[in-house]
């Protein structure tokens, strides 16, 4: 340290402006009023103590977080001057604390170099604190003064200081009126910065204590070796190329330069930390530019002197030479010029030349005296150069391939429509289910009666044709939905072949999801022979079937009701839901093209019966009503033979039976039955005479029934036998009733509660829920019996039902009676159509191009092979500004590889191409970034955490500017959905789940759904919880402690196992992403 010879007094405190603006616009001075700005207050006070250390007057700084949340900073420097300031007429201490930009650096007398400035930072701290107390030990006295919200309380007090020590103590409590998010300091955030300062100022001891009741800890940071020890700390878990750290320090034109360097064998990127006046310059600056230039020039010069590079060889690039380098450069500049208010880039042009000169001389000398180290560094740089050339060739190959495919973006990127990077965001997700799907010749079942391949769908979409598919709606019923965005998603994809129990085969990617019978999804590669798949069944109507009155129309099986529905009625519902038209009573559905198999919603219109019949009459004049056809029919109907046949037919028992059956079938038709019931109800409600007559008739009937002695006797006998078989029951009932209901208030309360609970709606919902439970369990068991026996063996089912003792499995006759109106054929049909099964899954050796479509709202569709599959390509996003990039599996661990292998990796190729960036040197241009929010969105499991770490490693090592400039985010999807009654809550941690449950009554009923992966969420859930900017939670990634971040990436992603195991065992169980300040 260099000590100044001038005195440090009040006349060296220069006043520039007042303090009033600080409280009005605190963000201009400390960056924000959040956690970052709060901790900046501490840094400003500590920087003042560091200034004393830089000037050579301070060796020990003590920082304490006090029990009341305030902070105290003590140094053993000279102490803030206390004599009267010539300009303000107040003490220098009061001037320093109350006047903005009153500091010891201005005017040049107090400090030779300075980061934080006495009076510049501390006055801001004073303005933004509820109170500040300052003690100064100087000139044999202890001086004290208190300030509140920037205003002095009283005058400077002085008492004798027997010890004649010197120094300054500043205590402050941040103002909650300014820091509305809280004033709690984070120990680790402060410790990280203080440790960094101790490395940068060799020989200065920094003591940091936390005196809060729940913490009580203390650390000391003292590094005699300064930045040399800093480099040693960062390379602890790496393998050094040379044991001795290359170190130099020097001074020129009052600029002090200190550099420490070490190359490592097992690192493929560089970590260079730059500091100017103890301030981390994350955006670089002239000092780092000078260091990089001198490293490149010096190493190339040494390489040629030692014949490592021949005359015809090109120079090694700066990236080649710096591969594997860990270094720290710290400069102390008398008049620093920082670009931007955050002081993150040094702008002094003279510093570049000074660094170049001082480091060049020292580095050349070191390498000349250590030829083995020189050779090792150059050899690693040469290998890096060769790898870069291989990477360049691989990169060019990727570019040429993209040009040949007429696309510069990866095929599986589901891009957004916006071209404005500032509003665009990309979600990097797991799995190919968001990209590749089916072979191009796979057929999709369409509602126009066709089965069309994915390739044909792409072509028809280009031609402007709108197609519609079958889908399972959110309530489990069959529906139709439009198809959009038919496209090829990936080339040369690995696929598997799935064979169904109906003999159909499907070629798809291994992780594409199939819909199970219960509405959930499962990846193709995970399907088993026991899985029950959601089926698609279609048939053509015939009047020979019970209740069917029209021939030749398509019908589709609805899994929710286990019944056949006319497809045109399902499409009609879609039109009404979309508001295409409003359904009115007694309207008819009409196929525009007169093709009753084309059930596309846009082929349907609704007409009044009169218009519909008129349209058909108009059309029929060209078919059945041609004159020749009419005349032929007339002659037939008038013939005696025809009349005899019709008469005989009407009188035959078979015809009478048919007519009777048709009449009964009408009453099995739910629509007909509902119409008749509504008609009767309308008649009943509007006919008071009939209601009175009906009531009298019912009353007369029950009187007549109970007037007969045998009826009264029979009922009395039933009651008598019941109590005879249970002798103690009468007394027990009596006693219980007396105990329970002798309190009138209790009786009144119970009556009220019962009335509230057992509403008609509640009774109906309870009945439906029980009915569905019995229905689903019985149907599934019957289907299993059919599969195991090859046919529906009722006796086998009864044996199974009895053996399980499951009361919810109904007898087959009861099942038919309750749900199928005693029609066994209908029940057997429901069992037959219940599901599909897998019979085989096998790998396919060749790779193929794969395709996908997008299905809005429901995100599933039916294949012509008879099963429903998931459309997961772009669920739950806003296509205007949100893009999705799926990555298959875990990307390459770049911590263990070189550039050539990185560029050959398919997933990294897709990533860097989608972002619009290269990864190093001239290739990397941050201005070309296509999205200003790059969001890592992985599952909440071990694999998801690993993939997230691999991606963060890649960005940190190879696209560091994305991290430094705040473009990288981590999505925080919920872990649980908690449902109670009609309300639901999303919980993002176990703690949040337990807190929510604790708010329920002790006997509350609730259900918990654990989201193991994003694929388990419905699209709307994913949007509401994770992707909607209005409601989501995302963590922005930034680096506070660069050295610690570098070390952690090395530990977690490097080759050495022992440090990684120790780290995971120490911290693994403590990590909660939702609490993590990333």
Swiss-Prot record:
It catalyses: ATP-dependent breakage, passage and rejoining of double-stranded DNA. This is DNA gyrase subunit B. This protein undergoes a protein self splicing that involves a post-translational excision of the intervening region (intein) followed by peptide ligation. The gene is gyrB. Heterotetramer, composed of two GyrA and two GyrB chains. In the heterotetramer, GyrA contains the active site tyrosine that forms a transient covalent intermediate with DNA, while GyrB binds cofactors and catalyzes ATP hydrolysis. Mg(2+) 1 binds at residues 895, 939. The lineage of its organism: Bacteria, Bacillati, Cyanobacteriota, Cyanophyceae, Synechococcales. Keywords: ATP-binding, Cytoplasm, DNA-binding, Isomerase, Magnesium, Metal-binding, Nucleotide-binding, Topoisomerase. Binds two Mg(2+) per subunit. It comes from Synechocystis sp. (strain ATCC 27184 / PCC 6803 / Kazusa).
């Amino acid at each position: 340290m260099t000590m100044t010879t001038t005195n440090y007094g009040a006349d060296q405190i220069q006043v520039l402006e007042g303090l009033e603006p600080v409280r009005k616009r605190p963000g201009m001075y400390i960056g924000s009023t959040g956690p970052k700005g709060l901790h900046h207050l501490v840094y400003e006070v500590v920087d003042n103590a560091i200034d004393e250390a830089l000037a050579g007057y301070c060796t020990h700084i003590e920082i304490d977080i006090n029990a009341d949340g305030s902070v105290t900073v003590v140094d053993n420097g000279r102490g803030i001057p206390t004599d009267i300031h010539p300009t303000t007429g107040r003490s220098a201490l009061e001037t320093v604390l109350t006047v903005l930009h009153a500091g010891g650096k201005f005017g040049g007398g107090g400090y030779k170099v300075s980061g934080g400035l006495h009076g510049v930072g501390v006055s801001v701290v004073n303005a933004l604190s509820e109170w500040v107390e300052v003690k100064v030990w100087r000139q044999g006295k202890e001086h004290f003064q208190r300030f509140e919200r920037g205003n002095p309380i009283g005058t400077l007090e002085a008492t004798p200081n027997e010890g004649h020590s010197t120094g300054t103590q500043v205590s402050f409590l941040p103002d909650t009126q300014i820091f509305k998010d809280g004033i709690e300091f984070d120990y680790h955030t402060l410790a990280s910065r203080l440790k960094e300062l101790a490395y940068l100022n060799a020989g200065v001891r920094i003591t940091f204590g936390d005196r809060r009741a729940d913490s009580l800890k203390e650390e000391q940071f003292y590094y005699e070796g300064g930045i040399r020890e800093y480099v040693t700390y960062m390379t602890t878990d790496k393998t050094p190329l040379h044991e001795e750290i290359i170190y130099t320090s020097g001074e020129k034109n009052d600029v002090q330069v200190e550099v420490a360097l070490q190359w490592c064998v097992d690192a493929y990127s560089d970590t260079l930390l730059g500091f100017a006046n103890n301030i981390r310059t994350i955006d670089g600056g002239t000092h780092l530019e000078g260091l990089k230039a001198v490293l490149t020039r010096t190493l190339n010069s040494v390489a040629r002197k030692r014949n490592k590079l021949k005359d015809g060889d090109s120079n090694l690039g700066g990236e080649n030479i710096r591969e594997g380098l860990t270094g720290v450069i710290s400069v102390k500049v008398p008049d620093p010029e920082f670009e931007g208010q955050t002081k993150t880039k040094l702008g002094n042009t003279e510093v570049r030349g000074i660094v170049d000169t001082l480091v060049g001389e020292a580095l050349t000398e070191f390498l000349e005296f250590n030829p083995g180290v020189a050779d090792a560094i150059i050899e690693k740089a040469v290998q890096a150069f060769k790898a870069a050339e291989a990477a360049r060739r691989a990169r060019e190959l990727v570019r040429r391939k993209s040009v040949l495919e007429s696309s510069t973006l990866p095929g599986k990127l589901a891009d957004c429509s916006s071209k404005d990077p500032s509003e665009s965001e990309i979600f990097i997700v797991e799995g190919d289910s968001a990209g590749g799907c089916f072979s191009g010749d796979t057929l999709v079942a369409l509602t126009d009666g066709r089965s069309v391949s994915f390739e044909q769908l792409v072509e028809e979409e280009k031609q402007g044709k709108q197609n519609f598919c079958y889908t399972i709606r959110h309530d489990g019923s069959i529906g139709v939905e439009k198809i959009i965005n038919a496209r090829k998603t990936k080339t040369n994809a690995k696929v598997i072949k799935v064979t169904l129990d109906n003999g159909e085969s499907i070629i798809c990617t291994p992780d594409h999801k199939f819909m199970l019978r219960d509405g959930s999804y499962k990846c193709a590669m995970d399907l088993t022979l026991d899985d029950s798949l959601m089926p698609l069944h279609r048939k053509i109507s015939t009047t020979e079937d019970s209740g069917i009155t029209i021939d030749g129309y398509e019908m589709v099986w609805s899994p929710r009701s286990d019944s056949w529905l006319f497809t045109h009625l399902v499409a009609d519902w879609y039109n009404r839901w979309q508001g295409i038209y409003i359904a009115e009573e007694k309207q008819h559905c009409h196929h525009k093209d007169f093709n009753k198999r084309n059930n596309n919603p846009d082929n349907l219109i609704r007409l009044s019966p009169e218009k519909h019949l008129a349209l058909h009459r108009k059309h029929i004049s060209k078919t059945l009503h041609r004159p020749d056809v009419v005349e032929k029919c007339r002659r037939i109907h008038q013939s005696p033979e025809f009349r005899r046949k019709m008469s005989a037919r009407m009188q035959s028992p078979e015809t009478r039976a048919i007519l009777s059956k048709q009449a009964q079938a009408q009453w099995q038709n739910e629509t007909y039955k509902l119409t008749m019931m509504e008609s009767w109800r309308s008649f009943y409600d509007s006919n008071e005479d009939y209601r009175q007559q009906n009531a009298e008739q019912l009353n007369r009937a029950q009187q007549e029934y109970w007037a007969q002695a045998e009826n009264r006797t029979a009922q009395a006998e039933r009651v008598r036998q019941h109590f005879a078989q249970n002798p103690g029951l009468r007394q027990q009932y009596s006693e219980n009733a007396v105990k329970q209901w002798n309190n009138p208030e209790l009786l009144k309360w119970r009556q009220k509660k019962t009335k509230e609970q057992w509403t008609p709606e509640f009774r109906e919902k309870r009945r439906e829920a029980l009915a569905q439970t019995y229905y689903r369990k019985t149907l599934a068991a019957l289907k299993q019996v059919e599969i195991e026996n090859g046919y529906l063996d009722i006796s086998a089912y009864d044996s199974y039902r009895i053996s399980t003792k499951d009361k919810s499995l109904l007898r087959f006759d009861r099942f038919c009676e309750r749900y199928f109106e005693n029609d066994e054929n209908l029940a057997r049909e429901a069992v037959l159509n219940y599901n599909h099964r897998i019979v085989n899954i096998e790998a396919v050796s060749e790779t193929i191009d794969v395709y996908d479509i997008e299905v809005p709202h429901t995100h599933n569709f039916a294949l012509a092979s008879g099963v429903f599959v998931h459309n997961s390509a772009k669920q739950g996003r806003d296509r205007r500004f949100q893009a999705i990039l799926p990555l298959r599996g875990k990307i390459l661990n770049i911590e263990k590889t070189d550039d050539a292998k990185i560029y050959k990796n398919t997933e990294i190729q897709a990533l860097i191409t989608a972002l619009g960036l290269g990864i190093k040197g001239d290739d990397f241009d941050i201005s070309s970034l296509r999205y200003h929010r790059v969001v890592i969105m992985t599952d909440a499991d071990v694999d998801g955490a690993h993939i997230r770490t691999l991606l963060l490693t890649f960005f940190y090592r190879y696209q560091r500017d994305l991290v430094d400039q705040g473009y990288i985010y981590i999505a925080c999807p919920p872990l649980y959905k908690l449902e109670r009654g009609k309300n639901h809550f999303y919980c993002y941690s176990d703690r949040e789940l337990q807190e929510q449950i604790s708010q329920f009554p002790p006997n509350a009923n609730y259900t918990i759904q654990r989201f193991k992966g994003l694929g388990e969420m419905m699209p709307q859930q994913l949007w509401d919880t994770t992707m909607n900017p209005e409601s989501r939670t995302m963590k922005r990634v930034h680096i506070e402690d660069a050295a610690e971040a570098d070390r952690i990436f090395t530990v977690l992603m490097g080759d050495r196992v022992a440090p990684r195991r120790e780290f995971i065992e120490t911290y693994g169980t403590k990590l909660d992403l939702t609490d993590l300040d990333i």
